[in-house]
Amino acid sequence: MRTEAQISDAIRLALGSDPGLVLWRNNVGVAEHWNGRGVDVVRYGLAPGSADFVGVLLPAGRFIALEIKSPTGRATPDQVTWLALVRKMGGFAAVVRSVAEARAAIERARGGASE
């Protein structure tokens, strides 16, 4: 069984050559930074639950969000909320588990679906 990281890498490589799509890898998390007096907590990424890939579908400039999961992985409540917000605002959002699912999702987005 492939891990989410392996699936994510395969999707990035497969979709990276699509001239009608621009995708960015979005890392979300928390880190600790020693500031000389103590530890600062640093949060990074767009927002809690934001998708693994965010991007723009050309030529209209439609926002797209892809959440990558392993075959048995489940979206967290924060991820479900993020994906719903993207759809509500007119973007396209999907959970995908393979390159084939990612390609199919992009084609649905091109057809006007919100997912």
Residue ranges and their predicted role:
Residues 1-115:
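Catalytic phosphate/metal-binding cores of nucleic-acid and nucleotide-processing enzymes, i.e., regions
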